[in-house]
Amino acid sequence: MGFYENLAAQSAPITVAPESTSYFSESNPGLDPRLFRSEQLIGTVRQDILGLLFNHLKAHYYNPEAYTHAWLAGSGVSFQWAAQRDPADLDCLVGIDYNSFRRANSQYVGFSDQEIADTINDDLRTELWPQTSHYLGVFELTFYVNVASDIRQIKPYAAYSLTDDDWVVEPQIMSAPTNKKWEQLVDRDLAQGTGIVDRYTKALTAIEASKNDAARLNAQSALKLAVQQGAALFDAIHSGRSLAFSKNGLGYEDYANYRWQSGKASGLIPALKTMKEISTKSRQEFESQTYGMTLPDVKILIRRALRYNN
């Protein structure tokens, strides 16, 4: 099966439909009772999440307890936890003492802090995330290593230390910023993204209705372009949001976070994320059929070379 055939096979109807988000929801008077008793994390939840994380890390790295700190962070541990989303978001952020990591894992001596974080995140994303996509039946629990070892540097809504069983950034009553210029900009995102989804839908319909090779190839080319554009817009919005929660960003009140959250509320982000996944899966399927394996990107190859040469 060629690339275009793989792309069409991975594609399915996509809609842009509004959904509830915590960012634009009213603050609750208390924290999520599925996780907290008063303002203390339920002990069994804390131990379970730490167990999931460290069991995974021990399978790949030596002595992770010596250099790893873990927090629950974001809307899931804030007063804005009650948006009607299924599953609800729950983020476990991981800090690494990189010098201690290198001492315990000598094959990573030549790695930068960013390369170590990327390596661990690759493993977390492919191996641990699928196990925790419906944690406790209600949460999408994700694990992510930040290059910054101190979580306060990324300005989270709130952060609870799983390691120390205490708050590092206590939750506050917050509400989304109001800014007419920002509203105009996100409306432009929605118009652009909806146009991409419309072209995607038309191309998919044209492929199914095509009666000759030329018509099918034209429709497949249009589908490929729409998927590429959707994936690129998703990456642009997502990377901006990542910068919002960095040392130089403004966190909750950053425009890039507002842009991301507005896209989630309008349904644009889920639609673009689906297009990004279609792009990735069709490429991987084509590579697997052509080369017998999925080809790693250049950054992964460099990290592997560094590891094996140390």
Language-model features: where?
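Extended acidic low-complexity intrinsically disordered regions
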Residues: 2-11
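Catalytic core of pol beta-like nucleotidyltransferases
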Residues: 11-87, 95-310
